[in-house]
């Protein structure tokens, strides 16, 4: 079967067909193509301009996605094939693209297959068999998180797909793509990577099936898994395979190994004998005791932060070996990666805009890592708590490229930041002292045993030069062609309070009317479980922000991010948060119901029902409990499971203020006119009328008292249309001017069912959307029509 997200594989595309020995049309402009035809990115150059030269600064203008593009680059064979669950946008914010550029910079030939069809491996065979390996990634998000909401409802859009359409990738994309790769290229190494594989590298809880799952490495039957940021690990994999060496023993990877009689993995690297070893709870132990998942997650968190230990988890009679995490990138390496010639545009193959491209096009990544260590966040587990920052010169050079690539020579930079904007150049004094005493080339390690650099208070050893970040923003704003600079990634409130001068600069110069801050909750007990500072910190930040905005003469607002149904949060805690918002006359717009994503401490607490100290906590586990808590802050969200329709205002919770619904005077005037004409109000029978609290009834119902649509072809309803019938084509049709004309003795034309009849009572079927429903409510298959 074919879909709309991939080119047809059963026939060569038009641009892939040979053209009498001339240059491939897929990589160079075709004769007769209009010069002003644009690609998917609004305001970009024409497709002819985009493909006039396949090379830019020693790199392909776009990594190839077809055989024609390979031929234009002079490549007969790929070294590495990257399979990605996102559309191909050549921007450093997309992980597979960044890794592909990084490998090309080191002499490897890399191709990309973006969002392939998963019914067959044909899309993976377009560019032939790669020489070294196939890399598989589900995309920038976990595929299940990208497909389903916090209430397990199917999402209707996808920001990483052309046109924002959902359905371009399968559920559990890593598993599906890995199976396709093994089917397409038997015997070729398959390497997993990305956020989905990284957070599912050991036994984990899967919220969407409400069950424990073993490591994704076993289910995918892949050869290797790269966790965390994969530049160094993937480059080492390519080099080893090119030299014919083993993939085992690379930092930042995981693999399956056999064990000896002492349950020690065989063929371990010799240099690991002097490293600390962490024995994780086995998969069977986690299945038997729920609290073992919490201990497993805590140990993984320690391993990532300490950086000098390798871990082992038994799964049956085999061992899952986790190598020590890859070291953080240096400033020089970060500068080299982000200096590569990214096109910052979607591949010209796409005809529809990609929402993620629109959001990230003018953003600049200044650093990686986050020292916050929030229990519900996976960034610290994926990127690490150590901050890897770019130099100021590298960021300024990227800003100049943005100006040069803009259509009118002017650009508004939406963000210069990372996971937290005001952590650029942040570092730990203890780690600096340890690194200074270490021998050259030694493996980095950390003496710190804290779970967070900012909880319960900001650590004295955590140095955050926020004024340097402010100076960087001012330098970027002073560049010719830069209209404005904003900080869209948000700031950490407790860090900003420690530097009032930086807070004044963020407020007065780099806030575009709204500043994103994440207090998450106001109950002290819930904040402790989240590893967030107390509410007094946010209130002090809010007071300072309002004062600085007044001094700057600007009307600005704080956008607070709140969370409901967190493990340990009760209905009373949510009512307390609702009262806190009511006292400040705030109507929450950014409220997220907690989603137990794999790998986080909060997910482990959700599964076992205990906090990090082993004490029992309340967990809103069912969808009804989670929805009830969520609707305390957002009364109009969804429907209550125990009854149909929207809930009334009094269900919003004690103390929550709800504005009355504004009356639509136009609808009232129309209803008055219809009543004067003897007709029912227009809203009667409508599904979307909010004041009708009854469950919605079918569109066509013979028993309702409202006036149906007029039809002068059937006498049984006094001239009104009877659903499911049409006029007999064998008899002439004479329209009647009034509904009661059939009562004057005129013979009305007979009608016959337009669809097949029910076998029992010969009653016709009624159309309802894409289905056919008989009068008893039973569904039937739509009849085939050629």
Where are these regions (language model features)?
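Basic Arg/Gly/Lys-rich low-complexity intrinsically disordered segments
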Residues: 1-44, 636-786
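N-terminal [4Fe-4S]-dependent radical SAM core
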Residues: 51-77, 87, 294-363
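Conserved SAM/AdoMet-binding glycine-rich loop
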Residues: 75, 80-85, 98, 113, ...
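N-terminal pre-triad scaffold of radical SAM enzymes
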Residues: 85-88, 351-378, 412-414, 595
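Glycine-rich beta-alpha loop elements in corrinoid/cobalamin-binding modules
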Residues: 87, 95, 114-315, 322, ...
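Terminal amphipathic helices with adjacent charged low-complexity linkers/tails
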Residues: 119, 247-304, 312-317, 325-329, ...
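Flexible glycine/acidic-rich beta-alpha junction loops that bind and position SAM and/or redox cofactors
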Residues: 142-151, 199-201, 231-236, 259-263, ...
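Conserved, mostly hydrophobic/aromatic
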Residues: 223, 337, 395, 517, ...
């Amino acid at each position: 079967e074919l879909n709309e997200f991939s080119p047809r594989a059963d026939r060569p595309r038009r641009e892939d067909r040979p053209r009498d020995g001339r240059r491939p049309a897929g990589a160079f402009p075709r004769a007769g193509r209009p010069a002003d035809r644009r690609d998917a990115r609004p305001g970009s150059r024409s497709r002819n301009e985009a493909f006039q030269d396949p090379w830019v600064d020693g790199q392909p203008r776009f990594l190839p996605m077809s055989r024609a593009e390979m031929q234009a680059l002079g490549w007969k064979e790929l070294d590495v094939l990257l399979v990605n669950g996102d559309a191909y946008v050549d921007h450093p914010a997309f992980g597979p693209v960044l890794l592909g550029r990084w490998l090309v910079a080191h002499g490897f030939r890399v191709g990309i297959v973006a969002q392939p069809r998963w019914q067959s491996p044909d899309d993976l065979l377009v560019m032939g068999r790669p020489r070294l390996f196939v890399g598989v990634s589900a995309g920038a998000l976990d595929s299940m998180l990208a497909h389903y909401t916090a209430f397990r409802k199917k999402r209707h859009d996808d920001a990483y797909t052309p046109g924002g359409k959902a359905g371009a990738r399968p559920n559990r994309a890593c598993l599906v793509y890995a199976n396709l790769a093994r089917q397409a290229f038997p015997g070729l190494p398959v390497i997993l990577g990305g956020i989905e594989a990284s957070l599912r590298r050991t036994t984990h809880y899967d919220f969407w099936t409400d069950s424990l799952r073993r490591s994704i490495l076993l289910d995918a039957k892949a050869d290797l898994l790269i966790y965390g940021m994969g530049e160094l690990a993937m480059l080492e994999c390519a080099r080893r395979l090119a030299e014919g060496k083993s993939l085992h023993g690379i930092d930042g990877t995981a693999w399956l190994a056999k064990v000896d009689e002492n349950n020690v993995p065989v063929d371990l690297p010799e240099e690991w004998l002097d490293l600390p070893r962490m024995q994780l709870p086995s998969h069977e132990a986690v299945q038997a005791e729920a609290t073992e998942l919490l201990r497993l997650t805590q140990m993984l968190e320690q391993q990532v932060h300490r950086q000098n230990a390798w871990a082992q988890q038994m799964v049956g009679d085999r061992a899952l070996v986790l190598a020590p995490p890859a070291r953080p990138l240096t400033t020089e390496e970060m500068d080299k990666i982000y200096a590569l010639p990214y096109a910052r545009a979607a591949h010209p193959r796409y005809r529809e805009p990609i929402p993620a491209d629109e959001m990230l096009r003018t953003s600049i990544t200044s650093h990686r890592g986050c020292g916050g260590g929030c229990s519900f966040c996976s960034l610290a587990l994926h990127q690490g708590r150590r901050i890897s920052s770019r130099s100021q010169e590298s960021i300024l050079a990227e800003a100049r490229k943005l100006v040069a690539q803009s259509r009118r020579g002017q650009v508004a930079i939406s963000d210069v930041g990372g996971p937290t904007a005001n952590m650029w150049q942040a570092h730990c004094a203890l780690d600096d002292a340890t690194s200074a005493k270490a021998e050259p080339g030694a493996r980095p390690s950390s003496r710190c045993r804290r779970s967070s650099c900012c909880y319960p208070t900001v650590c004295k050893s955590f140095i955050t030069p926020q004024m340097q970040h402010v100076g960087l923003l001012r330098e970027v704003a002073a560049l010719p062609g830069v209209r404005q600079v904003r900080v869209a990634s948000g700031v950490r409130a407790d860090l900003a309070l420690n530097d009032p001068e930086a807070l004044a600069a963020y407020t007065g110069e780099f806030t575009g009317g709204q500043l994103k801050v994440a207090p998450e909750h106001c109950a002290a007990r819930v904040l402790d479980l989240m590893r967030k500072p107390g509410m007094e910190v946010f209130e002090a930040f809010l007071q300072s922000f309002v004062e600085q905005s007044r001094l700057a003469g600007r009307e600005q607002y704080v956008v607070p991010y709140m969370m409901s149904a967190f493990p340990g949060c009760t209905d009373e805690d949510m009512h307390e948060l609702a009262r806190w918002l009511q006292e400040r006359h705030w109507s929450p717009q950014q409220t997220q119901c907690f989603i137990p994503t794999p790998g986080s401490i909060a997910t482990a607490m959700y599964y076992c029902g205990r906090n990090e100290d082993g004490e029992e906590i309340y967990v809103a586990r069912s969808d009804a409990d989670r929805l009830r808590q969520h609707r305390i802050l957002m009364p109009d969200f969804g429907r209550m499971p125990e009854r149909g329709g929207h809930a009334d205002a009094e269900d919003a919770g004690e103390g929550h203020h709800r504005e009355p619904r504004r009356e639509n005077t136009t609808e009232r005037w129309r209803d008055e006119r219809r009543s004067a004409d003897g007709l029912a109000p227009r809203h009667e029978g409508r599904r979307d009328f909010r004041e009708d609290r009854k469950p919605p009834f079918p569109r066509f119902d013979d028993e309702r008292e409202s006036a149906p649509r007029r039809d002068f072809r059937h006498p049984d309803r006094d001239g009104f249309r009877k659903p499911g019938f049409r006029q007999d084509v064998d008899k002439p049709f004479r329209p009647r001017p009034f509904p009661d004309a059939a009562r004057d003795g005129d013979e009305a034309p007979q009608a016959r069912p337009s669809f097949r009849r029910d076998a029992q009572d010969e009653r016709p079927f009624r159309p309802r959307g894409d289905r056919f429903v008989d009068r008893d409510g039973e569904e039937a298959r739509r009849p085939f029509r050629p």
